[in-house]
Amino acid sequence: MIIPSIDLIEGNIVRLYQGNYDTKTFYQNNIYDIALKYYNQGAKIVHLVDLDGALCPNNKQTSLIKNLLNYFNFHIQVGGGIRSYKDVETLLLNGAKRVVIGSSAINNITEVEKWLLEFGYKSIVLALDVYVRNNGYKEVVINGWKNRSNVSLESVLERFSTLGIKYVLCTDVKKDGTCLGPNFTLYKNISKLFKNVCFQLSGGIGTISDVISAKKSGIKDIIIGRALLENKFSLLEAIRC
């Protein structure tokens, strides 16, 4: 499934380059128009990211996210700055199809395990942003990609897979926002290790050829952001290829 992504800072659509907030690009698209465009082109679910909240939970774009969830009648998964049971509950009550949990899965892992059991695996997406070192070690980065965790991707997946986690959004930070092609080796390796997990590929998709290769690699879901915003190809083309 192709999942279009919309990242927001102060109500504006943006894209970061390799997760760096200092290299953000603003787009003039109206968020309501672009989300509706994706839906009309066949999106089954839209990935919405509150980058203000990801960087600082106290700055979450709460009102905007709520308005978007109330406005649209299609499925949306929401991430960015989700740090508490109340955050998860509120988003689901406001209409989010899934809630994306990132930094909290590292900083407060026991609490997140409770959320998974409480709200169910269909409502939670585990978001693991990784920095792949030269030696191949895959370290999870947190807090808006600002901090390293000293925790490996595999160790987090191992723990949550025993609890029945279904959806995992995995981003290679060095590929994010580049449109230079995904790290297919990363996704092939983790898909083989954790066969019961539905991985969402994120980072690097820039051409239709990338989409075709991603589909052939066995990844269930493919998240695309910048390439769609810059009209490198349409969502409809990505779905049909």
UniProtKB/Swiss-Prot annotation:
One of its GO terms (cellular component) is cytoplasm. Pfam families: His_biosynth. The active site is at D7, D129. This is 1-(5-phosphoribosyl)-5-[(5-phosphoribosylamino)methylideneamino] imidazole-4-carboxamide isomerase. HAMAP family: HisA. One of its GO terms (biological process) is L-tryptophan biosynthetic process. Its main location: cytoplasm. One of its GO terms (molecular function) is 1-(5-phosphoribosyl)-5-[(5-phosphoribosylamino)methylideneamino]imidazole-4-carboxamide isomerase activity. Its EC number is 5.3.1.16. It catalyses: 1-(5-phospho-beta-D-ribosyl)-5-[(5-phospho-beta-D-ribosylamino)methylideneamino]imidazole-4-carboxamide = 5-[(5-phospho-1-deoxy-D-ribulos-1-ylimino)methylamino]-1-(5-phospho-beta-D-ribosyl)imidazole-4-carboxamide.
